[in-house]
Amino acid sequence: MWNLRITPLSFGAACQGIFTSTLLLSALTVPLVCTIVYDSCLYMDINASRALANVYDLPDDFFPKIDDLVRDAKDALEPYWKSDSIKKHVLIATHFVDLIEDFWQTTQGMHEIAESLRAVIPPTTAPVPTGYLIQHEEAEEIPLGDLFKHQEERIVSFQPDYPITARIHAHLKAYAKINEESLDRARRLLWWHYNCLLWGEANVTNYISRLRTWLSTPEKYRGRDAPTIEAITRPIQVAQGGRKTSSGTRKPRGLEPRRRKVKTTVVYGRRRSKSRDRRAPSPQRAGSPLPRSSSSHHRSPSPRK
């Protein structure tokens, strides 16, 4: 992809290299607005917004390598591409797939050119300190067309007669560093969006919350293994698959007046003594007291008389 032939005395080629890098700067630098400001323009749930912000704090080794990440994202997006889906996560993930594929190869080429320039830089040349190189946060505030000018002014302030080949090397290292940091943010956002398509935004939000809790807990107080999104979503999948669907339709509630339940109470008669003679059953209603005989209306003579 990159063919570069430089001789130690090719001053004109070195000057041409600076001019060429100025013209190609707009094509070699990742658009920062795509990786920083885009999520503030989208409407999403407050919990999902916090989880998306927490993605930036996860360890770098948590995310797959760029080649593996792009391949996994394409596999997840392929069904949506076939159906021409316009879902939010599909559109944004597709944008980042294209962005990462294009600028990752470009950034790798910039590193290769910078390494090949080391052979023609005078051995006594001191490298440009990091403080004189434009950082990612500063590049966000500088217009893209003025980025080369600002970097050149810093190199001149470090050493006015800095060698031309060393200047090109410093420019390429600064731009490649900016690209790498922008691509890292794009990589994390791509992981978020295509996993939302695979598992659902709510499940990914829950997973990020549990993972951050596990990472912030001291090692002796937490489990040995980190939580996985498969383990979080498995109970939900089992519960949904185990439900039995009824053939009939469920009657909607609230359309008819509610029937009042009638409570039946059975009142039992007095318990009769075993010593008394059993009387024949009377035609009285069950549970009603037995009528007294006519003799029971007269009082028995008092034993005192």
UniProtKB/Swiss-Prot annotation:
Q: Which domain of life is it from?
A: Viruses
Composition-biased stretches, type Basic residues, lie in 258-277, 295-305
The entry's localization annotation reads:
Secreted
Secreted found in the keyword field: yes
Give the positions of the site Cleavage: 272-273
Q: InterPro entries this protein is in?
A: Hepatitis_core, Viral_capsid_core_dom_sf_HBV
Point out the coiled-coil segments of this chain: none
Region Disordered, annotated ranges = 226-305
Q: Name one GO molecular function term.
A: structural molecule activity
User: Main location per UniProt?
Assistant: secreted
Q: Name one GO cellular component term.
A: extracellular region
Enumerate the propeptide ranges: 273-305
**Keywords associated with the record:** Host-virus interaction, Secreted, Signal, Viral immunoevasion
User: Which Pfam families does the protein's record reference?
Assistant: Hepatitis_core
Q: Which family does it belong to?
A: Belongs to the avihepadnavirus precore antigen family.
What is the stated purpose of this protein?
A: May regulate immune response to the intracellular capsid in acting as a T-cell tolerogen, by having an immunoregulatory effect which prevents destruction of infected cells by cytotoxic T-cells.
Subunit structure, per the record?
Homodimerizes.
The protein here is known as External core antigen
| Organism for this UniProt entry | Duck hepatitis B virus (isolate brown Shanghai duck S5)
